[in-house]
């Protein structure tokens, strides 16, 4: 308790800091303390004692009364001030306390570090657990390794070894050079005279020497010999060494080696013979270290030559030297690896025979040769174990020095340093630096260097990142500054704070000189400077400077201190910088609308003039994403390495060009003076690689700069459409539809070819034209007939005389579908190998340019596979080729083969009386509309507008009988029998329209304006992350292309994908342009009933759900307007109410439930509507659509407003076609097949909750902040601080009387705990884990399916899914027991399928809870 008159402190940090007025703290009362706002725990607050009139408007004496004002950090991460008005705390304009703000910032940083520490500890524990798992797995796998059987020793090898050993122990049983003879020379005859003379002289000299030797001389000689041989003084050791000579040592060693060979060798015969020949030849120990160099063949060659050496050493030496030469010639038929091994063995044999003979002749022993060979092998082995170099790293892990370890590396560095340390030939210049022009840029992601230039602070764009404001540190002071502009380069311009304007400035260099550049930067708050010579590569520089942390954004200056570039990065070998120009300081001014229209008119005129001569196809430029815009994650590591290697190759190429330029560009008449000096051409460079090698290198890392020379060659020859990028696709003045204007007329009735068939190349010009903007150009038709030239203002694109259906082409676009490995993983045969690649003349120019080298490589693999009849390498090779094609915007070759095999669909032709419009336009159905006929499926309270010819059934009484279910045991739990697959007749269609009716809503916007305003405020506040969303291009939209294309396209195409393959994107763009120009076609929706598992009672009552789908062109127009918002909603499921895109796996369910529990409210509500999307009031649905539209970017919001109004009008007033051919009009509810059905239902659900909250509690915004909810369509689970009395009855009445919506009694469950409530088909248990709410429905879908499973593996996989869903159910639950029983049955039939028999408990918990790394409970 707080004593009266004592200052109040909320926590120990608050007492330690003691910010503000102590008098204000003394005024705190217990009532004021209990009503305090929710500040951050254990954080300081500042107390102020302020005059009341300065805060609350008042007059009289109360003006000068003082009130307590508290300022601090709130739990939602904001900074606010609150004043006590006598009864409660009221939020006021924040009062700035610099010390408090700094403290809160440090506390926030400390909390973040603690959180990082906690995560690191969790990761450490996870890694430790993984290590234990791996250790257990290692032990288990070791047990599975088969133990080798003991080798049986055969008696014959024991006998052979004994005989060879006996022969080896015979004295003189080896080659003696004195007794060798030769077949070429009679050595005895030649040396007879010399030998007799030498013998006589030798005997005479020995006799004279022995006559003069005394006893003392003999003792001294023995003593010196013993000392020289290091023989110990011990008498018994001298005796042993005396009797054991070299001869006896080798024989003992050979004897032991022979025994070991018999016992352990895998080829004892060959090894024993080698041992014997080594003794016989006299080479002995020198043979052993050469054996690993031999193959079986060369080993027998060596044995043969050693036997030959015993009889004739000169002949053996000659044959040994000739053996490698003959082997090189006669063994060339072998493959490379075997060929090299054989030649290596022959060379080793030659070295042994020749070297052994030299050693025996000079020293009488081969010990020296043995030592040399053994030393070479040891050095080779040591270099392998030690490594090539040592790396010395600093505390941050960055390499600061490398030390070579191999001898060749050390020698290379020595000669390099020796060459560099020659006589000084020049004088280094001084450079100008301005340390006062540098500062430090601090962001939450890290620090970098900036410099002052003009009125801006310049740094690297990747230092700023996505931050709008950054901290500028200069001379110990910190300033907040706003990021002004970031061009396409990796440069950012920051507005200089007013207090920093008098500082020094760096000017740009007008005459760049790259002979000596200076890099200045701050590293750990220390100024570092380095100079180097730079090389220019397009818009970038490279120089040999090692980058350290914090150098990004530093200025790169010339020797006069003028800025040349902005330092970017370091790939480990060279530093890099982007060149900065004066034009980079200011955004490029976008052309006005009039200028754009003029350019468009001129471009169209040029197209029309050249259409007859140069037919072209559609060109679509892929959006270019720079390296700065890419996020560095685990999945991007390979791309980043490729980009770095591409840059290093380009740097190396330019440097070599600069060095070789003086030698390669010698002109006639020039002298050789100065030819040896290095002259660098900094602006130009000659490619040293061939075009094929260059393209192969670019395929590993394409970017705009290095690929510009290829873009000009493929303009007009490459088709496709731009990928959607929600961050980089848009710009303020160009959103993809800028080419459409009010005064520009497009004729889209002409057929547009989106295929990749080889077009006629455009004529070459002397000056290459710049890459045009993505556009669609009409392909001219047959112009062979003479036509009168029309005036320029009347010229139009030629129209077809007769509408024709365009069949799918074999080279059609795949529309952005990435290749999937499963499509390639099948048994390939010779036909597949022959037809996977088209003939060379069928390849497009884009294929040749982008995929040329890969296609050549695949053709080689195909030829080899057909010859060897081994097709195992084809799937991976074709997959890699298709993957590269997909990344380049081309169609995969497997898809082309499929298109050929499938061929065009044989469907009825389009009606001839529709003219150029036929079935492409959105209102084409109107021309087919016939007068109404008999009313069969449309209820009487809906209008019957007419009849359309369609062939679709209105009866469905099919109940599939799956024979695979006969394998499953008979169930003992029959609760599932109340469910079944839907069947219907005409009455079900009539009944399905009841979803739109329950009660009539009132004009709630007029009756309850304050509550509606509160609901709007809450909706804008909840979905504020949708602010500034964009309209995307129609060709960048994503949608399920396997869906029906609606009427009348469904008469000619089964799916939208077939329609796209036949006609491409031209009809889509034409219809969007038509709507944009003011036309308002009426769209036709197609209605069908949903096949699903529902209660048998509903089936008997024909209560089946209806689904409506619109024309795919209309759906994609809606995707243009709302796809960006939908994508953002799916990304914010953790913090927002909408759960579309949410996954309950990996702890997702528990995390969401914990989020509601953490609010601390006492009440939890489960809410379920009936006929939810059908009874949504049209006024409310239109209002939600308007709220969504208000989040769109301001410029685009006004530009496309009329398109959005037309789109919403067709949602609210739907012309619907039934399978019976009847056409009616629906004006109620949210259609279940529109593009944003679940997202719109979420927003309507949330808006209704906010209205309901204000209806019972009043529009209390502070109380609303304690409210939280999660919604998925009509599912709702919420937590609220208060619930009124008789809540269920009152809320049901409110929705019926005000909105006309139906909430059945019993569908509103209010509890003081979240346990037992359900959301998205799961009930929350005590551990906040999911339990299926209706397991009997799941069992019905297993035993009474509406679709037959294809095979037994699918049935087993379905059972595994049910086991996963039942993970947290009671062990004795009938559904869980039955699933386990079924798994045991199906697992016996699938022993070799690769599927697990069942999921273990550990696997189930890993899937639901996320495992150690993603564990949420």
From Swiss-Prot:
Transmembrane segments: 155-175, 240-260, 287-307, 314-334, 345-365
Keywords: ATP-binding, Coiled coil, Covalent protein-RNA linkage, Host membrane, Hydrolase, Membrane, Nucleotide-binding, Nucleotidyltransferase, Phosphoprotein, Protease, RNA-directed RNA polymerase, Serine protease, Transferase, Transmembrane, Transmembrane helix, Viral RNA replication
Modified residues (O-(5'-phospho-RNA)-tyrosine): 694
Catalysed reactions, semicolon-separated: RNA(n) + a ribonucleoside 5'-triphosphate = RNA(n+1) + diphosphate
Gene3D superfamilies assigned to the protein according to its UniProt record, in alphabetical order: 3.30.70.270, Trypsin-like serine proteases
Protein modification: Cleaved by the viral and host proteases. The protease is probably autocatalytically cleaved.
Domain of life of the organism encoding this protein: Viruses
Site feature (Cleavage) residues: 176-177, 420-421, 665-666, 756-757, 914-915
Residue span of region Disordered: 753-813
Basic and acidic residues bias locations: 784-796
GO cellular component: host cell membrane; membrane
Enzyme Commission number(s) of this protein: 3.4.21.-, 2.7.7.48
Limits of the RdRp catalytic domain: 1162-1288
A GO MF term: RNA-directed RNA polymerase activity
Active site, renumbered: 462, 490, 552
InterPro entries for this protein: Astro_1A, Astro_p19, Astro_VPg, DNA/RNA_pol_sf, Mamastrovirus_p20, Peptidase_S1_PA, Peptidase_S1_PA_chymotrypsin, Rev_trsase/Diguanyl_cyclase
GO biological process terms on file: DNA-templated transcription; proteolysis; viral RNA genome replication; viral translational frameshifting
Coiled-coil stretches noted in the UniProt entry, renumbered to this chain: 105-143, 588-615
Family indicated by similarity: Belongs to the astroviridae polyprotein 1AB family.
UniProt protein name: Non-structural polyprotein 1AB
Taxonomic path: Viruses, Riboviria, Orthornavirae, Pisuviricota, Stelpaviricetes
Gene that encodes the chain: ORF1
């Amino acid at each position: 308790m707080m004593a009266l008159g004592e200052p109040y402190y909320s926590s120990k940090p608050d007492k330690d800091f003691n910010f503000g007025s102590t008098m204000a703290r003394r005024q705190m009362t217990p009532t004021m303390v209990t009503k305090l706002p929710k500040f951050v725990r254990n954080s300081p607050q500042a107390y102020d004692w302020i005059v009341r009139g300065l805060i609350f408007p008042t007059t009289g004496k109360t003006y000068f009364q003082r009130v307590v004002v508290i300022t601090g950090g709130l739990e939602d991460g904001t900074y606010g001030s609150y004043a006590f008005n006598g009864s409660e705390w009221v939020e006021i304009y924040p009062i700035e306390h610099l010390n408090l703000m700094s403290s809160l910032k440090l506390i926030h940083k400390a909390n973040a570090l603690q959180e990082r520490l906690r995560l690191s500890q969790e990761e450490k524990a996870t890694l430790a657990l993984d290590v234990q798992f791996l250790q257990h797995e290692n032990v288990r796998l070791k047990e599975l390794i088969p133990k080798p059987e003991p080798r049986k020793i055969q008696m014959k090898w024991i006998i052979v070894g004994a005989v060879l050993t006996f022969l080896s122990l015979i004295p003189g049983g080896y080659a003696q050079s004195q007794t060798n003879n030769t077949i070429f020379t009679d050595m005895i005859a030649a040396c007879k005279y010399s030998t007799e003379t030498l013998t006589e002289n030798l005997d005479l000299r020995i006799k004279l020497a022995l006559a003069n030797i005394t006893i003392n001389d003999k003792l001294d000689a023995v003593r010196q010999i013993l000392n020289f041989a290091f023989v110990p003084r011990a008498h018994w050791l001298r005796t042993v060494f005396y009797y054991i000579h070299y001869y006896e040592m080798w024989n003992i060693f050979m004897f032991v080696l022979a025994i070991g060979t018999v016992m352990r060798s895998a080829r004892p015969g060959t090894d024993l013979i080698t041992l014997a020949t080594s003794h016989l030849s006299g080479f002995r120990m020198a043979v052993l270290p050469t054996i690993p160099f031999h193959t079986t063949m060369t080993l027998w060659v060596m044995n043969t030559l050693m036997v030959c050496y015993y009889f004739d050493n000169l002949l053996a030496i000659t044959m040994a030297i000739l053996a490698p030469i003959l082997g090189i010639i006669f063994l060339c038929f072998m493959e490379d690896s075997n060929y090299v091994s054989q030649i290596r063995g022959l060379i080793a044999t030659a070295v042994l025979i020749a070297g052994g003979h030299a050693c025996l002749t000079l020293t009488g022993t081969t010990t020296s040769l043995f030592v040399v060979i053994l030393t070479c092998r040891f050095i080779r082995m040591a270099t392998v174990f030690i490594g090539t170099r040592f790396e010395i790293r600093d505390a941050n892990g960055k390499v600061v020095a490398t030390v070579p370890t191999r001898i060749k590396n050390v020698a290379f560095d020595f000669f390099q340093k020796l060459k560099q340390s020659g006589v000084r030939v020049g004088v280094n210049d001084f450079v100008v630096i301005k340390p006062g022009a540098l500062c430090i840029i601090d962001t939450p992601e890290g620090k970098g260097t900036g410099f002052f230039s003009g009125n801006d602070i310049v740094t690297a764009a990747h230092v700023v990142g996505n931050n709008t404001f950054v901290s500028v540190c200069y001379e110990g002071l910190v300033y907040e500054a706003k990021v002004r502009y970031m061009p396409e380069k990796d440069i950012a311009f920051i507005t200089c704070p007013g207090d920093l304007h008098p500082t020094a400035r760096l000017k740009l260099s007008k005459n760049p000189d790259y002979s000596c550049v200076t890099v200045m930067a701050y590293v750990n708050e220390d100024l570092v400077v380095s100079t180097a010579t730079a090389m220019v590569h397009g818009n970038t520089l490279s120089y040999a400077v090692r980058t350290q942390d914090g150098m990004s954004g530093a200025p790169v200056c010339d020797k006069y201190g003028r800025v040349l570039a902005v330092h970017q990065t370091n790939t480990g070998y060279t530093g890099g910088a982007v060149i900065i120009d004066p034009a980079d300081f200011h955004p490029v001014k976008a052309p006005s609308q009039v200028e754009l229209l003029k350019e468009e008119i001129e471009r169209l005129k040029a197209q029309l003039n050249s259409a007859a001569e140069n037919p072209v196809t559609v060109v679509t430029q892929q959006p270019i994403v720079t390296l700065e815009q890419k996020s560095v994650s685990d999945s991007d590591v390979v791309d980043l390495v490729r980009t770095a290697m591409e840059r290093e190759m380009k740097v190396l190429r330019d440097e070599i060009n600069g060095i070789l330029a003086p030698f390669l560009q010698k002109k006639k008449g020039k002298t050789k003076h100065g030819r040896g000096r290095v002259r660098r051409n900094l602006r130009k460079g000659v490619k040293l690689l061939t075009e094929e090698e260059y393209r192969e290198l670019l395929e590993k890392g394409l970017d705009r700069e290095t690929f510009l020379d290829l873009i000009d060659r493929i303009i007009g020859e490459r088709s496709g459409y731009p990928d959607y990028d929600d961050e980089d696709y848009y710009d303020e003045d160009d959103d993809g539809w800028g080419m459409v204007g009010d005064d520009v007329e497009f004729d889209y009735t002409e057929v547009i070819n989106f295929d990749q068939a080889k077009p006629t190349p455009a004529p070459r010009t002397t000056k290459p034209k710049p890459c045009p903007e993505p556009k669609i150009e009409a392909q001219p038709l047959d112009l062979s007939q003479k036509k009168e030239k029309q005036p320029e203002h009347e010229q139009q694109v030629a129209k077809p005389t007769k509408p024709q259906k365009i069949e799918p082409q074999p080279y059609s676009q795949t529309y952005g579908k990435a290749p999937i490995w499963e499509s390639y993983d099948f048994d390939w045969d010779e036909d597949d190998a022959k037809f996977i690649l088209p003939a060379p003349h069928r390849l497009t120019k884009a294929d040749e340019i982008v995929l040329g080298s890969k296609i050549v490589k695949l053709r080689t693999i195909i030829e080899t596979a057909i010859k060897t009849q081994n097709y195992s390498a084809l799937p991976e090779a074709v997959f890699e080729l298709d993957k590269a094609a997909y990344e380049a915007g081309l169609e995969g070759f497997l898809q082309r083969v499929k298109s050929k095999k499938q061929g065009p669909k044989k469907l009825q032709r389009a009606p001839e009386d529709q003219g150029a419009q036929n079935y492409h336009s959105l209102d084409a159905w109107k021309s087919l509309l016939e007068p109404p006929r008999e009313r069969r499926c449309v209820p009487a309270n809906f209008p019957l507008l007419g009849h359309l010819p369609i062939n679709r059934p209105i009866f469905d009484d099919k109940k599939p009988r799956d024979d695979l279910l006969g394998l499953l045991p008979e169930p003992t739990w029959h609760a599932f029998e109340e469910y079944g697959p839907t069947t219907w007749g005409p009455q079900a269609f009539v009944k399905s329209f009841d979803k739109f009716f329950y009660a009539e809503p009132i004009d709630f916007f007029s009756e309850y304006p304050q509550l509606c305003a509160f609901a709007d405020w809450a909706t804008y506040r909840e979905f504020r992350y949708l602010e500034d969303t964009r309209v995307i291009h129609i060709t960048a939209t994503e949608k399920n292309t396997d869906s029906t294309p609606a009427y009348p396209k469904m008469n000619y195409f089964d799916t939208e994908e077939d329609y796209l393959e036949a006609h491409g994107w031209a009809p889509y763009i034409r219809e969007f342009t038509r709507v944009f120009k003011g036309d308002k076609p009426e769209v036709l929706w197609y209605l069908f009933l949903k096949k699903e598992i529902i209660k048998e009672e509903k089936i008997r009552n024909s209560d089946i759900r209806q689904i409506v789908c619109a024309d795919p062109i209309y759906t994609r127009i809606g995707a243009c307007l709302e796809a960006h918002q939908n994508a953002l909603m799916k990304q914010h499921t953790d913090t927002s109410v909408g759960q579309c895109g949410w996954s309950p796996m990996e702890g997702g369910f528990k995390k969401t439930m914990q989020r509601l529990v953490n609010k601390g409210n006492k009440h939890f509500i489960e809410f379920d509507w009936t006929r939810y999307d059908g009874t949504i009031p049209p006024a409310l649905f239109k209002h939600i659509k308007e709220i969504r539209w208000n989040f769109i970017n301001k410029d685009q919001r006004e530009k496309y407003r009329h398109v959005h109004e037309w789109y919403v009008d067709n949602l609210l007033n739907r012309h619907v076609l039934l399978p019976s051919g009847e056409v009616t009009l629906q004006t109620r509810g949210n259609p279940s097949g529109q593009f944003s059905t679940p997202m719109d239902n979420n927003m309507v659900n949330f808006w209704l909750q906010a209205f309901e909250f204000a209806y019972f509690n009043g529009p209390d915004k502070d109380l609303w902040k304690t409210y939280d909810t999660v919604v998925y369509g009509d599912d709702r689970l919420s937590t609220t601080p208060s619930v009124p009395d008789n809540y269920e009855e009152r809320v049901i009445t409110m929705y019926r009387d005000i909105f006309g919506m139906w909430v059945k009694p019993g569908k509103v469950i209010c509890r003081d705990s979240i346990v037992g409530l359900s959301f998205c088909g799961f009930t929350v248990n005590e551990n906040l884990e999911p339990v299926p709410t209706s397991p009997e429905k799941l069992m019905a879908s297993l035993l009474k399916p509406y679709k037959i499973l294809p095979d037994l593996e699918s049935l087993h996989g379905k059972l595994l899914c049910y086991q996963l869903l039942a993970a947290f159910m009671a062990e004795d639950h009938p559904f869980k027991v039955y699933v386990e029983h079924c798994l045991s049955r199906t697992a016996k039939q699938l022993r070799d399928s690769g599927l697990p028999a069942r999921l273990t408990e550990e696997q189930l918990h890993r899937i639901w809870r996320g495992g150690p790394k993603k564990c949420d409970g």
